[in-house]
Amino acid sequence: MNTLLMHCRPGFEGEVCAEIAEHAATLEIPGYAKSKPASAHVEFVCQDADGAERLMRRLRFADLIFPRQWARGPGFIELPESQRIEVLLAELASYPVCGSLWLEVLDTNAGKEVSTFCRKFEKPLRAALVKAGRLQEDPALPRLLLTFRSGREVFVGLAEPRNSALWPMGIPRLKFPREAPSRSTLKLEEAWHQFIPRSEWDKRLAPDMLAVDLGAAPGGWTWQLVNREMRVTAVDNGPMAENLMYSGLVDHQKVDGYQYRPRQRVDWMVCDIVEKPARTGALIETWIGEGLCREAVVNLKLPMKQRYAEVRKILQRLRESFDARGLKVAIGCKQLYHDREEVTCHLRRLER
């Protein structure tokens, strides 16, 4: 199992290659990354047979920015037109018994076509794996991840459930709320799923908390905050959706989001303004560093070519700034499924 397969947003293969190559070099695990443009996946081929397993053991998947999902295996294998299950059972003879099964496809148009095959194939495959003793429901065992590039080509991979994506392919199935004024609302909801354990939502996303939404109009992110019954200051020169204003929980301030400062410390600051990432990074530094908020979810827009390098530079600058202030801040950064040319950062001040 010398190959690490990583899913990603189409067009961001280069960022995944740069990110995993840097980590592998730091960990002294030799190998090389390979990908094709807009293929929505990257393979990192390790020189050592156990290289992919060592990478997964030494890295926290949650700390990776651009990969949506990962799995280790020997690479893609060919399947015949018939007797696919028999071939897979033979391939799995050297694998450990697995505790769960996910059939995955790539986030491409071809992948959408393959998903129909996967839905039909999963039930008989699952039954065959259970009968052969290769699959038993146990969250402590590795997860079997079968990534189909077509009905005839599959990556037979493994990953630990606690150190891989929360959802198949890293894609959450969130329902767009009809009352929300824009689809951007799903970005904030996904961020909460990604960065906050569900068991902590009632405590950290509680009613009557104070929140500020910078660049709020028309209110996609504000809607999520109001839905949690928070009191929100929506900062934007543009108009807000009427249903949000009627809630009685929103104070609309028509000022520049980068200039606004709250009169008192708030629980949450969220920001989805289209601006250069360095300027937004400085905004994060001010709000968290000066204690204007306890937690923040902020999007960094990435129109430039060296996108991974830019994100890494901003995150490093934030860490150095907080260290210099003597602050303990948890920082997470991920390109979410609902993100486009951007990444989402989550920051939380931790009391020393």
Curated annotation (Swiss-Prot):
Membrane-spanning parts: none
Location (main, coarse): cytoplasm
S-adenosyl-L-methionine found in the keyword field: yes
A GO term from the CC aspect: cytoplasm
Key words of the record: Cytoplasm, Methyltransferase, rRNA processing, S-adenosyl-L-methionine, Transferase
Superkingdom of the organism of origin: Bacteria
Subcellular location: Cytoplasm
Binding site for S-adenosyl-L-methionine: S184, A217, P218, G219, G220, D236, D256, D272
Reaction catalysed by this enzyme: cytidine(2498) in 23S rRNA + S-adenosyl-L-methionine = 2'-O-methylcytidine(2498) in 23S rRNA + S-adenosyl-L-homocysteine + H(+)
Catalytic residue positions: K301 (proton acceptor)
Xref: Pfam families: FtsJ, RlmM_FDX, RLMM_N
Class of this enzyme: transferase
Alphabetized InterPro entries for the sequence: RlmM_FDX, RlmM_THUMP-like, RNA_MeTrfase_FtsJ_dom, rRNA_MeTrfase_M, SAM-dependent_MTases_sf
GO molecular function per UniProt: S-adenosylmethionine-dependent methyltransferase activity
Entry EC no(s): 2.1.1.186
Job description of the protein: Catalyzes the 2'-O-methylation at nucleotide C2498 in 23S rRNA.
Subunit structure: Monomer.
HAMAP family recorded: 23SrRNA_methyltr_M
Family indicated by similarity: Belongs to the class I-like SAM-binding methyltransferase superfamily. RNA methyltransferase RlmE family. RlmM subfamily.
Protein name (Swiss-Prot/TrEMBL): Ribosomal RNA large subunit methyltransferase M
Provenance organism: Pseudomonas aeruginosa (strain LESB58)
Gene behind the chain: rlmM
